[in-house]
Amino acid sequence: PFLMTYGDGVCDVDMNKLVEFHKEHGKIATLTAVMLEQQKGVLDIGGDNAVKSFREKSHTDGAPINAGYMVLNPEIFDYIDGDDTVFEREPLEKLAKEGQLMSYMHKGFWQCMDTKREMDMLEKYLATGTAPWKKWD
């Protein structure tokens, strides 16, 4: 497996535990899920942590969302038709329908950087030395 993330968010997820969870469940893909009340991709997660459905960009009302940190097996490339494939649409939705997408629930720090306000907040964390995602010296 390999790790993939989007470039617009930070978090303090334990990558070793994420990879271990992925390997234990033997599915093609595992994404990190967080609880957030904003407009993001909504996950319908079953009792076994399998993702039952994946809907991008709707109002969440406190539902878990895709935090953008993933562990993927090479078979993921069979789900990508080409450069025009929207990863959050075809591949993730199809994997969920096939029972091949797992969710790893993260309860620590996570923040996207989709707006100037969010960027300013994250830069303030860095400037003051209080960035909760920074786990290195």
Where do the model's predicted regions map?
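Catalytic-core segments of class I nucleotidyltransferases/pyrophosphorylases
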Residues: F2-L3, V10, N16-K23, L36-E37, ...
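A short, conserved acidic/glycine-rich loop-to-beta-strand motif
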Residues: H25-M35
